[in-house]
């Protein structure tokens, strides 16, 4: 019954707004005009306010609060920078305009022409000389209210239901300024990384999203069909193999901010559609790339937050270089006491069983080690830690280690208990690369549907010759979570994937 009353109230409010819309139109007022000339935004106007000068301004925004007092009214508008108070007097705007103002609601978008002044309470405001309705809102927005309870500020009627916030992100952005702040920081993070890379002379490129063969990661793809060519295509799971082709083609450094797609589970760290930036630099190796990551992450955190410190999942985390380095074998030994070096697949499977892990019998040695690491080590690595020198089975695209047989030159950066980025000294020997991909193909035949496939065109490119190269992939969504302190990937993606309503 309570839900029905709430719905009835919403219907009544919407009907009243539809009636107001009709009344405005009957009065010759277009509730949806084409444009309005804005001369300044709220933050800019407040920052440049001068006590001894009445500056003429034209501002626009959404009405977020109204206080009517007979022949005068105060209301707040919200624009992309913040909020600003508007003062409106009936005697100055005229009877007709003030009557129109009475038809406006919270949520309507207006433009105001006037001059700046400071109220008796000290608030910098705009004294309206005229206003114009720019958009009549037909659906009421949820507006949080505040009151003091025993000396503490209490917020109620807030738009706080998480799933509803994700489904109606447009409303979330209107009423929750901290959400807007997170996405502004996300944009700043991407901009800083892009500037960092381009300042080195590296080229930003674009590679195919629809691919005839998927590769570059161990993951299940989304499939689609090209009608004209009558062929199956895949949404990319990574852009690695195409970027390496560009290194073969003669570029010394390339990077791409890419939407990648993996047909896998959804949780607070995984979304089927996510953003990565991948970077490939010729004549460098994974040790050089570790130093670059340290510099990049420290600079990015400072650029966005003003400090290299961040708080994530209740932990104070420092992104100040240098980061700890630990081989994957040493990390498993440190956190479980188990030894993985030199172990056969059967021995690793028994080891995992002794540790209490239930494993899919179809996976091989690399996946077993990955499961052990993911269960017992990764969640405990809170401060940024480079995990290095992985077994060959775990990294079919990485170069053999120069001094440790059976291992490859690879690192993952773990921070806050999750992988943030992944890097190799890239394998450029086409003979070894073919062997590795054929081994992956045999794992697929055993039933491992995340194993890679043999990409003959990529192998052909390597046969022309690729210089020594360092590669890096950074999960942008997770990096944003780390720097902003958000605890779910859904809070850093504007429109995360959800089950149907």
Swiss-Prot record:
GO terms for biological process: lysyl-tRNA aminoacylation. HAMAP family: Lys_tRNA_synth_class2. It catalyses: tRNA(Lys) + L-lysine + ATP = L-lysyl-tRNA(Lys) + AMP + diphosphate. InterPro entries: Aa-tRNA-synt_II (IPR004364), aa-tRNA-synth_II (IPR006195), aa-tRNA-synth_II/BPL/LPL (IPR045864), Lys-tRNA-ligase_II (IPR002313), Lys-tRNA-ligase_II_N (IPR044136), Lys-tRNA-synth_II_C (IPR018149), NA-bd_OB-fold (IPR012340), NA-bd_OB_tRNA (IPR004365). Keywords: Aminoacyl-tRNA synthetase, ATP-binding, Cytoplasm, Ligase, Magnesium, Metal-binding, Nucleotide-binding, Protein biosynthesis. The gene is lysS. This is Lysine--tRNA ligase. GO terms for molecular function: ATP binding; lysine-tRNA ligase activity; magnesium ion binding; tRNA binding. Mg(2+) 2 binds at residue 419. Its EC number is 6.1.1.6. Its main location: cytoplasm. Homodimer. Belongs to the class-II aminoacyl-tRNA synthetase family. Its cofactor is Mg(2+). Gene3D superfamilies: Bira Bifunctional Protein, Domain 2, Nucleic acid-binding proteins. It comes from Chlorobium luteolum (strain DSM 273 / BCRC 81028 / 2530).
